[in-house]
Amino acid sequence: MKRIQRVVLIDGPILPALLSFAFPILLSNIFQQLYNTSDVMIVGRFLGQKSLAAVGATSAIFDLIVGFAVGVGNGMGIIIARNYGAKNEDQLRKSVAATAIIGCILSLFVIFIGAVGLFPLLQFLGTPSAIVSQSYLYIATIVNGVAVTFAYNLCAGLLRAVGDSLAALYFLIIAAILNILLDLYFITQLHLGVQSAGIATIIAQGISALLCIFYIRKKVPFLLPHRKVFVWDKELYQDLLSQGLAMGLMTSIVSIGTVILQSAINQLGTTIISAQVAARRIMSFAVLPITAIASSITTFISQNFGAEQFQRIKKGVTIANLLSWVWSVLVAALLFFTSPSLTSFISGSTNPDLIANASLYLQISSCFYPILASLIILRNALQGMGKKLTPLTSSFIELFGKIFFVLWIIPHTGYMGVILCEPLIWIPMTLQLIIIYRKIRYQLLTE
């Protein structure tokens, strides 16, 4: 395999390798967040709070449907990274071919489910009648383009699996800028409304996916499968599906809990809906360095697991945890003082109730970010080792916790219950992952 300007993760100093690999992922994640955040900012400023609430009311469904497809792709990428670490080029090509086939089938499945169930689901969740039609137009557009989303995440995942986290960043920057320009053009010039924000997102992601494919074809052609590797391999497909569906289901279970939580938020009115979407957008940016480190540790562990370097895996997880804890403390302190101004900037609103509620959400939840950091790092570490059940069990803890809050806490505490819901659930989730990780680490190091 020809190696060009890719970070070496299976030998050498761990900290520089993780940082070098994580930094482009961080920048990619920032621009990925700009997709939805630019939608929120532009919709809020030019279409008003009602339209902003319409977009916000779909966020949980968006995460459920699109997150499933992306989770499956990321899960199968772990198998690809493992084959790369083991220097098994033939199996690597077969894995890419099988992943593409599975991705096409799953994309069609998601589109079908969306066509049948989106509007009833919005109604079931208690989406206010004043915004339900706008919500449907936006989320239906996103779901119909899920194949484009999967294609980009697959291509970017392939590059990251072989240590090239920088290339996808360049394409994503172009796409993010294009998304903002299209949002502004469609909304302010063509007056297409909320739906145009979804259209702009899909067009931008499609361009990013095409650029990624062209790059792979020219620079890393060994990733491209040829015709003879498109063959039925029962063991390979089972391995890819089990790993992919485990991550996809994990994401979906988390998102189902978020959908249930969204149903409670929808009962609190459009101001709270808008406050929640603004706060969540800010939180998404705040934890991006943590998720970037976690993404890098998944690839790091997958490659080193394939190379059977278990002591290096232990050191990598320790370093990743320390890095994420330092960031968590810094960003929590920052959010405590800047939440009101950030909320006003993101939402485009001067509504004091909206700003106060969103700020309270950020100031309280950020105190729990060190716990969230360990949760994300350990879950990704276990996924990198190919452990499917433990992260899935962790997701069930989150699901049942959110159901408990929606049924018995939020009806009595209002938005404060929403604020405390996830942070308090992170605690048992993290404890479970710590226990399992230490047990598996001991087994690997004593074999």
Language-model features: where?
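Transmembrane alpha-helix boundary and packing residues in multipass membrane permease domains
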Residues: 25, 29, 41, 78, ...
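Alpha-helical transmembrane segments of multipass membrane proteins
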Residues: 37, 112, 154-158, 180-185, ...
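Residue-level signal for short hydrophobic patches within transmembrane helices
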Residues: 11, 15-34, 38, 61-68, ...
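Small-residue-rich hydrophobic transmembrane alpha-helices
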Residues: 52-112, 149-168, 262, 276-339, ...
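Short runs within selected transmembrane alpha-helices of multi-pass transporters and secretion channels
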Residues: 73, 141-160, 168-176, 197-210, ...
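Helix-terminus/linker motif at the lipid-water interface of multi-pass membrane proteins
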Residues: 30, 34-53, 122-129, 185-192, ...
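Transmembrane helical elements of multi-pass membrane transporters/channels
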Residues: 20-39, 141, 152, 175, ...
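Short alpha-helical transmembrane segments in multi-pass integral membrane proteins
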Residues: 1-22, 80-145, 191-245, 301-368, ...
